């Protein structure tokens, strides 16, 4: 058994839509840049909400990134990076187990791996890769939004179709913004039926 290298770690930033996950990832990466550490930031090919080649928060913060589809793509571009940041982990085309293995592989080689993404899908079920990384990470930060219905802390992403909750048999992944999703608390969240 090999011992993880000094300095390698996995940090997870998770939460519902509009909780500030990408904003926090960008904040951490700005610190990395100030510290003059080598880094790569990756964004999924599937996320077409903003400009390609950038991670972008809903509030408008942006950093340059490499657009990729799979963990294999990430590993191919991550050489010599001290820090690897992966935004919107749940949107990658790869098998969740491959995403987890890749993050572990990087961390075991001394890389600081920062991942951000939804912990729950619109059905309030855990995304598989995120579920495993939450258990394996050295640091976990769960962020909260504000429920659009009552103002409490929101932990759920309510997907809407024509103003009504999406049915349970709708596709799990649909990239969208304020026109499709609302942040809701446990009480105001309406389960998919």
Curated annotation (Swiss-Prot):
Any one GO cellular component localisation term in the record: cytosol
GO biological process: DNA biosynthetic process; thymidine metabolic process
Record localization: Cytoplasm
Annotated active site: 88
Binding of ATP, residues: 15-22, 87-90
Chain positions recorded as Zn(2+) binding sites: 147, 150, 185, 188
Superkingdom to which the source organism belongs: Bacteria
A molecular-function term among this protein's GO annotations: thymidine kinase activity
Catalytic activity: thymidine + ATP = dTMP + ADP + H(+)
Keywords: ATP-binding, Cytoplasm, DNA synthesis, Kinase, Metal-binding, Nucleotide-binding, Transferase, Zinc
EC number: 2.7.1.21
Pfam families for the chain: TK
Zinc found in the keyword field: yes
Database matches in PANTHER family: THYMIDINE KINASE (PTHR11441), THYMIDINE KINASE, CYTOSOLIC (PTHR11441:SF0)
The family this protein is said to belong to: Belongs to the thymidine kinase family.
Subunit structure of this chain's protein: Homotetramer.
UniProt-recorded name of the protein: Thymidine kinase
Species whose genome carries this gene: Chloroflexus aurantiacus (strain ATCC 29366 / DSM 635 / J-10-fl)
Lineage: Bacteria, Bacillati, Chloroflexota, Chloroflexia, Chloroflexales
